[in-house]
């Protein structure tokens, strides 16, 4: 049993060996099916799933990004996409046609545009080119909302502020 309160600004690392249930645990939180877990009313949850299950593969990347924006602004959408190396060609493609790396970068752009209060990240370094990791780590480190992070990449985790850890072996 886990007893933890994750408030605005708190960054929590969920750790443990492969197969212990970290992804299942945070997926249940993200989908609001975890027993004993309550997400505050009105808190927008941004979920980065390592298997891209939150993406509609038949939708264009552009429409995926546009769909999460409260204020539809073409310039903001395109500049955010560009900051994650997604150009006009990538945006016009269906998500299913993107490379795994582009799908990962699309998820990050989507989270930026979504502006969540709670960010849940399941192995966000999977499929991402190692050259892009410092930029992503810096963005996560500066994230002002609450965050739950699962990562098996110590070099990446060291670059992100972690306020508390949940050891799944102890649960």
Model regions and ranges:
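ABC ATP-binding cassette signature C-motif
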Residues: 1-171
């Amino acid at each position: 049993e886990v007893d933890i309160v994750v408030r605005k600004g708190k960054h929590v690392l969920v750790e443990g060996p492969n197969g212990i249930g970290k992804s299942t645990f945070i997926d249940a939180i993200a989908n609001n099916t975890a027993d004993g877990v309550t997400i505050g009313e009105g808190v927008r949850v941004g979920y980065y799933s390592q298997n891209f299950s939150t993406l509609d593969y038949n939708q264009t990347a552009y429409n995926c990004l546009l769909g999460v924006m409260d204020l539809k602004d073409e310039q903001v959408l395109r500049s955010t996409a560009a900051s994650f190396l997604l150009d006009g060609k990538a945006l016009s493609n269906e998500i299913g046609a993107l490379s795994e790396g582009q799908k990962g970068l699309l998820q990050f752009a989507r989270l930026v545009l979504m502006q969540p209060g709670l960010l849940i990240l399941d192995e966000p370094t999977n499929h991402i080119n190692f050259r892009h990791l410092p930029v992503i780590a810096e963005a996560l480190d500066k994230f002002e909302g609450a965050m739950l992070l699962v990562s098996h990449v110590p070099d990446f985790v060291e670059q992100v502020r972690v306020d508390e850890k949940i050891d799944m072996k102890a649960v």
